[in-house]
Protein backbone atom coordinates (compact mmCIF):
# COMPACT_ATOMS: atom_id res chain seq x y z
CA UNK A 1 0.00 0.00 0.00
CA UNK A 2 1.25 3.46 -0.90
CA UNK A 3 2.47 5.61 2.00
CA UNK A 4 2.62 9.40 2.28
CA UNK A 5 4.18 11.59 4.94
CA UNK A 6 2.65 14.81 6.23
CA UNK A 7 3.49 17.09 9.17
CA UNK A 8 -0.09 17.72 10.33
CA UNK A 9 -3.15 15.91 8.99
CA UNK A 10 -6.57 17.31 9.86
CA UNK A 11 -9.62 15.14 9.24
CA UNK A 12 -12.59 17.37 8.48
CA UNK A 13 -12.79 20.65 6.55
CA UNK A 14 -15.64 22.18 8.53
CA UNK A 15 -15.28 25.34 10.64
CA UNK A 16 -13.26 23.58 13.35
CA UNK A 17 -10.94 21.84 10.90
CA UNK A 18 -10.27 24.95 8.83
CA UNK A 19 -9.71 27.08 11.94
CA UNK A 20 -7.24 24.54 13.31
CA UNK A 21 -5.47 24.45 9.94
CA UNK A 22 -5.18 28.24 9.84
CA UNK A 23 -3.72 28.46 13.34
CA UNK A 24 -1.25 25.64 12.69
CA UNK A 25 -0.17 27.19 9.39
CA UNK A 26 0.31 30.57 11.07
CA UNK A 27 2.67 28.83 13.49
CA UNK A 28 4.72 27.58 10.54
CA UNK A 29 3.42 24.03 10.17
CA UNK A 30 2.74 22.24 6.89
CA UNK A 31 -0.93 21.28 7.04
CA UNK A 32 -3.10 18.91 5.01
CA UNK A 33 -6.88 18.81 5.50
CA UNK A 34 -8.93 15.82 4.29
CA UNK A 35 -12.71 15.88 3.87
CA UNK A 36 -15.19 13.45 2.33
CA UNK A 37 -17.22 16.21 0.66
CA UNK A 38 -16.43 18.16 -2.49
CA UNK A 39 -16.58 21.58 -0.80
CA UNK A 40 -14.73 23.23 2.06
CA UNK A 41 -16.76 24.56 4.99
CA UNK A 42 -18.87 21.69 6.29
CA UNK A 43 -22.02 22.79 8.09
CA UNK A 44 -21.34 26.44 7.26
CA UNK A 45 -22.78 25.86 3.79
CA UNK A 46 -26.17 25.10 5.36
CA UNK A 47 -26.20 28.40 7.21
CA UNK A 48 -27.85 31.01 4.99
CA UNK A 49 -28.66 33.38 7.86
CA UNK A 50 -26.40 36.16 9.11
CA UNK A 51 -24.41 35.37 12.23
CA UNK A 52 -24.54 37.41 15.43
CA UNK A 53 -21.61 38.20 17.70
CA UNK A 54 -18.40 40.18 17.56
CA UNK A 55 -17.18 41.79 14.35
CA UNK A 56 -13.88 39.89 14.56
CA UNK A 57 -15.85 36.63 14.74
CA UNK A 58 -17.59 37.01 11.37
CA UNK A 59 -20.70 38.77 12.69
CA UNK A 60 -23.02 39.92 9.92
CA UNK A 61 -21.79 37.26 7.50
CA UNK A 62 -23.72 34.24 6.27
CA UNK A 63 -22.34 30.78 6.87
CA UNK A 64 -21.34 30.08 3.28
CA UNK A 65 -19.59 33.47 3.14
CA UNK A 66 -17.61 32.57 6.26
CA UNK A 67 -16.66 29.26 4.66
CA UNK A 68 -15.29 31.00 1.57
CA UNK A 69 -13.36 33.50 3.68
CA UNK A 70 -11.78 30.78 5.81
CA UNK A 71 -10.96 28.73 2.71
CA UNK A 72 -9.21 31.68 1.10
CA UNK A 73 -7.24 32.45 4.26
CA UNK A 74 -6.17 28.83 4.64
CA UNK A 75 -5.05 28.52 1.02
CA UNK A 76 -3.09 31.78 1.24
CA UNK A 77 -1.23 30.22 4.18
CA UNK A 78 -0.37 27.18 2.07
CA UNK A 79 -2.83 24.70 3.57
CA UNK A 80 -3.32 21.65 1.33
CA UNK A 81 -6.88 20.34 0.90
CA UNK A 82 -7.87 16.80 -0.10
CA UNK A 83 -11.56 16.76 -0.99
CA UNK A 84 -13.70 13.71 -1.82
CA UNK A 85 -11.39 11.91 0.56
CA UNK A 86 -12.38 9.41 3.24
CA UNK A 87 -10.32 8.74 6.37
CA UNK A 88 -11.47 5.28 7.43
CA UNK A 89 -9.23 4.49 10.38
CA UNK A 90 -6.20 5.35 12.48
CA UNK A 91 -3.68 2.53 12.78
CA UNK A 92 -0.21 2.19 14.22
CA UNK A 93 1.13 2.53 10.68
CA UNK A 94 -0.78 5.78 10.11
CA UNK A 95 -4.16 7.05 8.91
CA UNK A 96 -6.02 5.00 6.32
CA UNK A 97 -7.16 7.21 3.44
CA UNK A 98 -9.15 6.62 0.26
CA UNK A 99 -8.68 9.40 -2.27
CA UNK A 100 -9.60 9.38 -5.96
CA UNK A 101 -10.10 5.63 -5.75
CA UNK A 102 -6.64 5.02 -4.30
CA UNK A 103 -6.07 3.49 -0.87
CA UNK A 104 -3.03 4.64 1.07
CA UNK A 105 -1.57 5.29 4.51
CA UNK A 106 -0.64 8.77 5.70
CA UNK A 107 2.10 8.98 8.30
CA UNK A 108 1.59 12.30 10.07
CA UNK A 109 3.47 13.76 13.02
CA UNK A 110 0.17 15.06 14.37
CA UNK A 111 -3.43 14.12 13.54
CA UNK A 112 -6.36 16.37 14.41
CA UNK A 113 -9.85 14.88 14.14
CA UNK A 114 -12.48 17.53 13.39
CA UNK A 115 -15.09 15.28 11.84
CA UNK A 116 -18.15 17.31 12.80
CA UNK A 117 -20.69 17.53 15.59
CA UNK A 118 -23.63 15.33 16.44
CA UNK A 119 -27.03 16.89 17.03
CA UNK A 120 -28.93 16.20 20.22
CA UNK A 121 -32.21 14.44 19.66
CA UNK A 122 -35.23 13.32 21.65
CA UNK A 123 -36.65 9.81 21.36
CA UNK A 124 -40.43 9.49 21.37
CA UNK A 125 -42.99 7.07 19.91
CA UNK A 126 -42.84 7.45 16.15
CA UNK A 127 -39.51 9.29 16.14
CA UNK A 128 -38.09 6.86 13.55
CA UNK A 129 -40.91 7.41 11.04
CA UNK A 130 -39.97 8.92 7.68
CA UNK A 131 -40.70 12.62 7.96
CA UNK A 132 -39.11 13.01 11.39
CA UNK A 133 -35.66 14.52 10.93
CA UNK A 134 -33.05 16.58 12.71
CA UNK A 135 -32.52 20.26 12.01
CA UNK A 136 -29.29 19.66 10.12
CA UNK A 137 -30.99 17.29 7.70
CA UNK A 138 -33.76 19.81 7.05
CA UNK A 139 -31.18 22.53 6.38
CA UNK A 140 -29.22 20.26 4.04
CA UNK A 141 -32.34 19.44 2.04
CA UNK A 142 -33.65 23.01 1.82
CA UNK A 143 -30.49 25.12 1.71
CA UNK A 144 -28.13 22.88 -0.25
CA UNK A 145 -30.27 20.54 -2.35
CA UNK A 146 -33.22 22.95 -2.71
CA UNK A 147 -35.70 20.25 -1.70
CA UNK A 148 -38.51 21.14 0.71
CA UNK A 149 -38.41 18.64 3.63
CA UNK A 150 -42.19 18.80 4.06
CA UNK A 151 -45.22 20.96 3.39
CA UNK A 152 -46.50 21.15 6.99
CA UNK A 153 -44.20 20.79 9.98
CA UNK A 154 -43.68 21.27 13.70
CA UNK A 155 -40.25 22.25 15.03
CA UNK A 156 -39.21 20.82 18.39
CA UNK A 157 -36.83 23.06 20.33
CA UNK A 158 -36.68 26.84 20.67
CA UNK A 159 -32.93 27.31 20.80
CA UNK A 160 -31.31 29.39 18.08
CA UNK A 161 -31.05 26.37 15.78
CA UNK A 162 -34.74 25.53 16.13
CA UNK A 163 -35.88 29.11 15.65
CA UNK A 164 -33.60 29.71 12.67
CA UNK A 165 -34.56 26.45 10.97
CA UNK A 166 -38.25 27.16 11.53
CA UNK A 167 -37.88 30.52 9.79
CA UNK A 168 -35.81 29.04 6.98
CA UNK A 169 -38.54 26.47 6.35
CA UNK A 170 -41.06 29.31 6.12
CA UNK A 171 -38.82 31.03 3.60
CA UNK A 172 -38.61 27.80 1.61
CA UNK A 173 -42.39 27.62 1.39
CA UNK A 174 -43.36 25.23 4.19
CA UNK A 175 -46.19 25.81 6.64
CA UNK A 176 -44.69 25.79 10.14
CA UNK A 177 -47.56 24.99 12.48
CA UNK A 178 -45.66 25.65 15.72
CA UNK A 179 -42.39 25.59 17.61
CA UNK A 180 -42.60 23.60 20.85
CA UNK A 181 -40.22 23.90 23.82
CA UNK A 182 -40.16 21.72 26.92
CA UNK A 183 -38.66 24.43 29.14
CA UNK A 184 -40.66 27.34 30.51
CA UNK A 185 -38.78 29.87 28.39
CA UNK A 186 -37.51 30.30 24.85
CA UNK A 187 -33.87 29.28 24.54
CA UNK A 188 -32.83 31.32 21.51
CA UNK A 189 -32.42 35.00 20.79
CA UNK A 190 -35.53 37.12 21.06
CA UNK A 191 -35.03 38.52 17.56
CA UNK A 192 -35.43 35.04 16.06
CA UNK A 193 -38.52 34.31 18.14
CA UNK A 194 -40.13 37.64 17.29
CA UNK A 195 -39.57 37.09 13.59
CA UNK A 196 -41.50 33.82 13.80
CA UNK A 197 -44.30 35.35 15.83
CA UNK A 198 -44.60 38.17 13.30
CA UNK A 199 -44.98 35.52 10.61
CA UNK A 200 -47.80 33.94 12.61
CA UNK A 201 -45.95 30.93 14.02
CA UNK A 202 -46.86 30.20 17.67
CA UNK A 203 -44.16 29.16 20.13
CA UNK A 204 -45.38 26.90 22.92
CA UNK A 205 -43.24 26.58 26.07
CA UNK A 206 -43.74 23.96 28.80
CA UNK A 207 -44.70 21.65 25.96
CA UNK A 208 -43.36 18.25 24.95
CA UNK A 209 -44.00 16.18 21.87
CA UNK A 210 -45.96 13.08 22.82
CA UNK A 211 -45.69 11.04 19.65
CA UNK A 212 -45.61 11.12 15.87
CA UNK A 213 -48.35 9.06 14.28
CA UNK A 214 -48.58 7.37 10.92
CA UNK A 215 -48.15 3.96 9.30
CA UNK A 216 -45.39 4.52 6.75
CA UNK A 217 -44.65 8.21 7.34
CA UNK A 218 -45.64 11.06 9.64
CA UNK A 219 -49.33 11.88 9.39
CA UNK A 220 -49.78 13.80 12.65
Q: What residue ranges belong to the model's regions?
A:
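FAD-binding core/adjacent interface of flavoenzyme oxidoreductases
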Residues: 1-11, 66-152
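Rossmann-like dinucleotide/flavin-binding elements
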Residues: 5, 11-32, 117-184
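Ligand-binding pocket scaffold of soluble enzyme catalytic domains
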Residues: 17, 103-105, 207
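Short glycine-/acidic-enriched loop or helix-start segments at secondary-structure transitions
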Residues: 20, 43, 92, 122-124, ...
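Predominant activation on well-ordered alpha-helical scaffold segments within soluble catalytic domains
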Residues: 22, 68-71, 109, 135-139, ...
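Conserved N-terminal glycine-rich FAD pyrophosphate-binding loop of Rossmann-like flavoproteins
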Residues: 37-61, 189-192, 199
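A Rossmann-like FAD-binding core segment of flavoenzymes
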Residues: 71-91, 95, 170-220
Amino acid sequence: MKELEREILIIGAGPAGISAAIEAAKAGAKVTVADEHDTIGGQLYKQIHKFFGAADNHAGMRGFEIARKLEQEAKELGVEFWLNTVAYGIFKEGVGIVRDGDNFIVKAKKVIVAAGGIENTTAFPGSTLPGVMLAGAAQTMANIHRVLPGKRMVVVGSGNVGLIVAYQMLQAGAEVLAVVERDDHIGGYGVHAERLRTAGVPIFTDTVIKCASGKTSVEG
